[in-house]
Regions:
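Short beta-strand segments
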Residues: 1, 30, 55-61, 79, ...
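Claisen-condensing/thiolase-fold acyl-transfer catalytic domains that form or cleave C-C bonds
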Residues: 3-5, 17-18, 22-23, 31-48, ...
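Acidic-glycine-rich active-site phosphate/pyrophosphate-binding loop
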Residues: 6-20, 57-63, 118-127, 179-191
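Short acidic, glycine/serine/threonine-rich loops at helix termini
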Residues: 8-10, 67-71, 239-243
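Flexible, glycine-rich active-site loops centered on histidine and acidic residues
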Residues: 48-82
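Condensing-enzyme catalytic core mediating Claisen C-C bond formation in acyl metabolism
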Residues: 71-143, 147, 151, 233, ...
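Conserved active-site "lid/cap" helical segment
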Residues: 116-168, 179-187, 212, 216, ...
Length: 247
């Protein structure tokens, strides 16, 4: 999440208390809109190393409290939502086959909340100036996303030793329909193999892929053995993708 209840304790610790999961380790992972895919990859690493047997990954945002409602360039894009997945071991041959993660911190100013950390402390003046809200260079983020989304999935496919024509379904971060269309074209996927629910919720950042995954699963979009790709990109600038064989 990039919208925790408070700086400390972490949102994960608040959730752990509410769930009564008192024996579970808990921490926040912040990679903005890439966060859920980062979380899945991190959880899978714990599972494959034998450290943990089950890991709960949650993406949750209240972005309506972090947008300036006078800025039509951002306030109409973002939404509130939450989604989760329990990651555990699956039979051999299934599960995550390839991953890709990356970041380019030099592009951080293209999508940021300038005040509220320790570099620029939030106060009445900075709230009045709108510095505690999301600031976005739309054209720059669009160029980054179009370049990155398809490329990161191709890298995950390569690491999974899969060909592009073996991909059965794609769950992209729900930020912009033009970005999703562009990624689908680069992956040579018809839109019926790409899940889109952007029109329902807007951009829910770290919750986006989690919500889309749940809805696609409930709608019966996957069958056992399907090769499914997930991809996210976001503030940082960050990106991540994975390809798994559905179980």
């Amino acid at each position: 999440t990039l919208t925790p209840d408070m700086i400390i304790p972490s949102a994960a610790c608040v959730l752990q208390a509410n769930l009564g999961a008192k024996n579970a380790a808990a921490y926040d992972l912040q990679a903005a809109c890439s966060g859920f895919v980062y979380g899945l990859i991190t959880a899978a690493s714990y599972i494959s190393s034998g450290i943990y047997k089950k890991v709960l990954v949650v993406g949750a945002e209240i972005l309506s409290r972090r947008v300036n409602w006078n800025d039509r360039g951002t306030c109409i894009l973002f939404g509130d939502g939450a989604g989760a997945a329990v990651v555990s071991e699956v039979p051999e041959g299934y599960g995550i086959k390839g991953i890709d993660m990356g970041a380019d911190g030099t592009g951080g100013s293209a999508l940021c909340i300038p005040a509220g950390g320790t570099a620029v402390v939030a106060n009445d003046q900075r709230v009045e100036e709108g510095l505690t809200f999301i600031h976005m260079d739309g054209p720059e983020v669009y160029k980054f996303a179009v370049k990155t989304m398809g490329r990161t999935v191709l890298k995950s496919l390569e690491r999974a030793d899969m060909e592009l024509n073996e991909l059965d379904y794609f769950i992209p971060h729900q930020a912009n329909i033009r970005i999703i269309d562009s990624a689908a074209k680069r992956l040579h996927l018809p839109m019926e193999k790409v899940f889109v629910n952007l029109h329902k919720y807007g951009n829910t950042s770290a919750a986006s892929v989690a919500i889309a995954l749940d809805e696609a699963n409930r709608e019966g979009r996957f069958k056992r053995g399907d090769n499914v790709a997930f991809a996210g990109f976001g503030a940082g600038l960050t990106w991540a993708s994975l390809v798994l064989k559905w179980y």
